[in-house]
Amino acid sequence: MPEYRSSTTTKGRNMAGARALWRATGMKTEDFSKPIIAVVNSFTQFVPGHVHLKDLGQLVCREIEAAGGVAKEFNTIAVDDGIAMGHDGMLYSLPSREIIADSVEYMANAHCADALVCISNCDKITPGMLMAALRLNIPAIFVSGGPMEAGKTKLSEHKLDLVDAMVIAADSSASDELTEEYERSACPTCGSCSGMFTANSMNCLTEAIGLSLPGNGTTLATHSDREQLFLTAARRIVDLTKRYYQDEDTSVLPRSIASFKAFENAMTLDIAMGGSTNTILHLLAAAQEAEVDFSMTHIDHLSRKVGQFCKVAPNTPKYHIEDVHRAGGIMAILGELDRAGLLHTDVPTVHSDTMKDALDAWDVMRNNDPELHKFFKAGPAGIPTQQAFSQSTRWSSLDLDRENGCIRSAEHAFSKEGGLAVLYGNIAEDGCIVKTAGVDESILLFKGKARIFESQDDAVKGILNDQVKEGDVVIIRYEGPKGGPGMQEMLYPTSYLKSKGLGKACALLTDGRFSGGTSGLSIGHCSPEAAAGGAIGLIEEGDEIIIDIPNRGINVSLTPEQLKARRQAMEAKGADAWKPAQPRPRKVTTALKAYALLATSADKGAVRDKELLK
């Protein structure tokens, strides 16, 4: 049977020094025959999605040790994309994903950890830890901090979130008093922001890919039910670890669970729930770590056959993550996908032998167990707090309306085509992404004149100064992984377009990316990016752009000969080719330059180019 990795540091006379150091951490002689399980926490006081995690790592550690393991906790970094948004701080967000993945690898390999419990929550932390778990391929389980409760003002029952606060702040007709009311009400509790933004999307996808427990993506951070998820994850990782090292059961390893079929399940869920476009970036990156051939081509194929079964903020103001939980959570969406013949149910998970077994136990539409239904009745208390597990409020009933409710059946889907689509054309030969769930039907086919901005900062100024008019296609380029560097999110430009009344009258195209809070005709991840020689860098002011979502097309009205001539003119610039026309007042540090040096375009997940490392 496989030997514990940790035995490298705990066995043999020559490891007396290592054992002495282990003893200094509290280990005893009898512990040297047990698995050492790394509890990878991400507590920080900078991020509301992580501010409540400080004591949860030790909660998991105690339960691991009660179950027969040795637990050792460490923390990764965590960047708050909302706080880093709209300034140079956003340059660091996506690169932090690689640092998180590397830090988990460094700690786990340096200390020969046998398994991982990944306590994640927000935008880059879950994907970073997922990449690390698949890279290491040792037993692992994910348990996130949980979603925030949706906010609301005292004056209205209308639910609020972070994006509402951003939009109203840019609306000159809104009073200072109303703006402050939104600001104070939008984010009332600890947890990841309350809509189907990137953090919640990724935590939901860990359920579909099989590496977290049912309820992980939707049980509120404040609810007492979430404590049981942490305790169960702790006990489960000890079982998974013993199954691998003692029983030689390789089916429990992350790469066995996160197979091609599992990635298809995750992407199918993402499309069905209208998740953040960032999830595509992160799933592509995770697939590379898992050595799974999963690409934009596969995503495009799925997007054409999967409908939208769930619609949540920012795609509608009616529902937030707490409402998805009330409707049965992610297992309920997966159940509807299964009934529609769109799910692989023969794949294993960390909690069930197969996804079919998981659905039989956890889908509220096929299991009437009162305890199961009680679990999904967990709801918000409406009490501002930074304390985990601080309330036990429950809805009086579940939302089981599959015709008009938050989660729909295939027959009554919000739309027959899903919430995400891949577009191709002479602007994006390797593809770009649009969240169709947030696009009004009236602009699914859009023609407009290009309005060029060579940084997000210039675009924000242009929008606020009324330089963008109805019918324009805002082009924000040189903001990709290399060009930014760091592939900034464009939430402020899209929010300001809304505040100017242009949300349904303009399009936005970028080689950067969008926040999970973005809606409207916002097209990102344009690949290849401008800095890598992509055609988005050849578009000129006033060019006609044609966006055809039904036919998955995006093109500039230029002939191949015209594009070739522009490319030759660009390349004739030598060292100044594929750079912004004017230098940007942007401080790019050595750390960011190092990231840019190896970064691939978005169609590859913006991961490091391994060919450059050979």
Swiss-Prot record:
Annotated pathway: Amino-acid biosynthesis; L-isoleucine biosynthesis; L-isoleucine from 2-oxobutanoate: step 3/4; Amino-acid biosynthesis; L-valine biosynthesis; L-valine from pyruvate: step 3/4
Keyword line: 2Fe-2S, Amino-acid biosynthesis, Branched-chain amino acid biosynthesis, Iron, Iron-sulfur, Lyase, Magnesium, Metal-binding
Catalytic activity, EC: 4.2.1.9
One Pfam entry name: ILV_EDD_C
GO molecular function annotation: 2 iron, 2 sulfur cluster binding; dihydroxy-acid dehydratase activity; magnesium ion binding
GO CC, one annotated term: cytosol
Binding site for Mg(2+): D81, D123, K124, E489
Active-site residues annotated for this sequence: S515
Location of N6-carboxylysine modifications: K124
Swiss-Prot/TrEMBL cofactor(s): [2Fe-2S] cluster; Mg(2+)
GO biological process, any: L-valine biosynthetic process
CC cofactor note: Binds 1 [2Fe-2S] cluster per subunit. This cluster acts as a Lewis acid cofactor.
Residues binding [2Fe-2S] cluster, per UniProt: C122, C193
InterPro entries: Dihydro-acid_dehy_C, DihydroxyA_deHydtase, DiOHA_6PGluconate_deHydtase_CS, ILV_EDD_C, ILV_EDD_N, IlvD/EDD_N
Catalytic activity: (2R)-2,3-dihydroxy-3-methylbutanoate = 3-methyl-2-oxobutanoate + H2O; (2R,3R)-2,3-dihydroxy-3-methylpentanoate = (S)-3-methyl-2-oxopentanoate + H2O
Transmembrane segment boundaries: none
Role played: Functions in the biosynthesis of branched-chain amino acids. Catalyzes the dehydration of (2R,3R)-2,3-dihydroxy-3-methylpentanoate (2,3-dihydroxy-3-methylvalerate) into 2-oxo-3-methylpentanoate (2-oxo-3-methylvalerate) and of (2R)-2,3-dihydroxy-3-methylbutanoate (2,3-dihydroxyisovalerate) into 2-oxo-3-methylbutanoate (2-oxoisovalerate), the penultimate precursor to L-isoleucine and L-valine, respectively.
Quaternary structure annotation from Swiss-Prot or TrEMBL: Homodimer.
Family designation: Belongs to the IlvD/Edd family.
Protein name, entry field: Dihydroxy-acid dehydratase
Species annotation: Hahella chejuensis (strain KCTC 2396)
Source species taxonomy: Bacteria, Pseudomonadati, Pseudomonadota, Gammaproteobacteria, Oceanospirillales
